[in-house]
Amino acid sequence: MKLSTIFTAFAATIATVAGYETTGSKQTVDILIDYIIKETPELSQNDVANWENGDTVTLQYVVNNNEESEITVVGVTGQFKNPINNEIVTNLTTGKVGPIAVPPGEAIKFDQKINVDLIPANYELIPHVFIAQDSLIKVIPCRGQLATIVDAAVSFFDPRLIFLELVLLITFAGLIYVGYEIWGKQYFKGVAPVKAKKVSAAKASSPVASGPSTTSATGYDTNWIPESHLKQKKTKKVN
């Protein structure tokens, strides 16, 4: 079988797939396909995988060819379904594989990486493998895997969160400054206490005359001098 024929048939099959079911009558094939999740190989079909948005899940397939003729693995795809009503939520991007030839009675392995980015909920992952055999492309569904998908927890030290915190902090500080310049200054001017003027000690302690004062010939006020002292001065002058 020519590789160009395989790829042409593969492309034509993808173009005519409706809901990932081939058109025409279904055929029974003796090809066994299973897979494990590399990140959690202990999970079985009866377990529920727990994934976070942003995770990359690696499916490792094992294809056993029990047919009498050679088969070729040429692609892989899949879908996430609602496990309750079986409705398709999203389809996985179709990926090219190999092509990898599998002789009768032999098995091969290959990987598929899936980037998880869905609305947090419960899903069922159902992969599909494209097999080329006798110039025909066959789409073989694999077992389903139940999975719970949640959003990843945001770390306080996440650079995106730190940047957002800085932007909010700068914005908040800017609003406070503008508010103070517009209203704060005027408000504080109106409620701020007025400082009393200080009077110097010299002015505060100087006596204030309460009555008329007389000045003697000597040039000073004699009202405060005792009379006896003044009489003694006059007596001395007479003598």
Swiss-Prot record:
Domain of life of the native organism: Eukaryota
Residues annotated as transmembrane: 162-182
Topological relation to the membrane, as annotated: Single-pass type I membrane protein
PANTHER family in the cross-refs: TRANSLOCON-ASSOCIATED PROTEIN SUBUNIT ALPHA, TRANSLOCON-ASSOCIATED PROTEIN, ALPHA SUBUNIT
GO CC annotation terms, alphabetical: endoplasmic reticulum membrane
KW Endoplasmic reticulum (keyword) present: yes
Lineage of producing organism: Eukaryota, Fungi, Dikarya, Ascomycota, Saccharomycotina
Encoding gene per record: IRC22-2
Keywords attached to this entry: Endoplasmic reticulum, Membrane, Signal, Transmembrane, Transmembrane helix
Residue intervals on the Cytoplasmic side: 183-239
A Pfam family of this chain: TRAP_alpha
Function field: Is probably involved in a pathway contributing to genomic integrity.
Family note: Belongs to the IRC22 family.
Disulfide-bonded cysteines: none
Chain intervals for the UniProt region annotation (Disordered): 201-222
Residue stretches of biased makeup (Low complexity): 201-213
Identification of the protein by name: Increased recombination centers protein 22-2
Record's subcellular location: Endoplasmic reticulum membrane
Originating organism: Candida albicans (strain WO-1)
All ranges on the Lumenal side of the membrane: 20-161
